Amino acid sequence: MKLGLARAAELMQASGQYEAEAVAVGYSIDSRTIQPGELFFAVRGERLDGHDFVEQAFGKGAVAAVVSRESKTRFVDRAKLLTVDDPLRALQKLAAAVRLIWGKPLIGITGSAGKTTTKEIVAHILANRHNVLKSQGNLNNHFGLPLQLLKLEPEHEFAVIEMGMSHAGEIRALADLARPDCGVVTLVAPVHLEFFESIADIARAKYELIESLPAGGIAVLNADDPYVSQFGRDFHGKVVTFGLQKPADVSARGIEARGPSGSAFDVVSNGQGVRATLPLLGEHSIYNALAGVTVGLQYGISLQEAAESLASLSAGDKRGQVIEFAGATIINDCYNSNPKALDSMVRALASMPAQRRIVVAGEMLELGTGAKDLHYENGRRMGPAGVSFVLGVRGLARSIVEGAAEEQVHGKFVESPEQAGAWLVENVRPGDLVLLKASRGVRLERALDLWMGKSADKSH
């Protein structure tokens, strides 16, 4: 939202010198990507201090910079400096003010997995009738979420915002900024256990979104998740549910697996069913789709419209992308991983025709003290899913290979994505089906890049 600097300074309680008529056309915390006319916030991160890049931001056309009062003396030319106690807090304060000024429905989405895909589906369905702002990528933390809120414009009728967390209290802080009218919780899984003592503690952290909803708000909950299904008990607003197994307000029936093309099913609500086609892989994607339909129904989208919208979805970057290469079918799902998501994708392979089903499984991070056992159990589930070979990549992925071996599934462990890529170059054959999945920190896409690059070289 464009704001005059005088108005922005007022909302942030900032002081300083600036041109009276100057206007911020956007907002940035990154001097590398800042655009002319944007307001630069010199926030301090874990490794970098934005105050070191103020001059660079001005060189790229920043209209002004928000700096801390204690750092003001670093700058000889103090024109176009807005001073505050803490630039990050000022960014958040301005974002919260813009959200209140905008004043229209905002849907907040959280969960241990599926947040980004569900956000995309919700926005896609609402866009049938409305102008929707959605958070970009997975910008879902105390830096990214305020920047998304500052993109709100009067013409936007809805906002769909993803909320992530690693520690208790973080969802509440994000919700205090975003003021969601509707909260969606996808599921609770053993993710970030490095920072929590139990899954129940993770659930309590996710519940902060529901606690933050207004009395007339809407809670959209997974009826099949043992934790999320309980979130509506003490909520005084409207509770609507989605699921496949337990009774739910929105469910799927007659699920037909269609291999790499995804699935088809009847979306059922209030006794009415509409056949839908979903070009995303795995049972977890059906849950995400049902969550999206459930939100759409709350805001005037018909069941027919919502169900038909699913057919035009596409997989996001490194999120279940299906690639045909050198006679093999590749499923690039290496954006992130956790035990539940890996299991869902592995089970999806069972419905796909293939000469061999190969799983390239990277280490899953932030699982806490039980991480080794969780990796091992994922490996044990490879056999029943018809997996032919498991390639474990880095660290605790060795336990995935060991678990798979117990179920007579052959495997190999390598230390790096580069070694995995070299193995793929030499061993994948036409007709193979290959799944790549790992936590973001493993950078498993390097294996895919190496494989496709080297294989292309070999073919010339």
Predicted features, each with a name:
Residues 1-93, 352-354, 380-381, 385-395, ...:
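N-terminal leader/targeting and accessory segments in enzymes
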Residues 8-11, 71-77, 184-329, 354-355, ...:
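Acidic, Mg2+-coordinating active-site environments of NTP-dependent enzymes
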Residues 9, 89-218, 223, 229-235, ...:
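Phosphate-binding loop of NTP-binding sites
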Residues 63-64, 105, 157, 181, ...:
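Short acidic/polar active-site loop segments enriched in Thr and Asp
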Residues 109, 126, 317-321, 441-449, ...:
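ATP-dependent carboxylate/acyl-activation modules
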Residues 413, 431-452:
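Peripheral docking tails and interdomain loops at the edges
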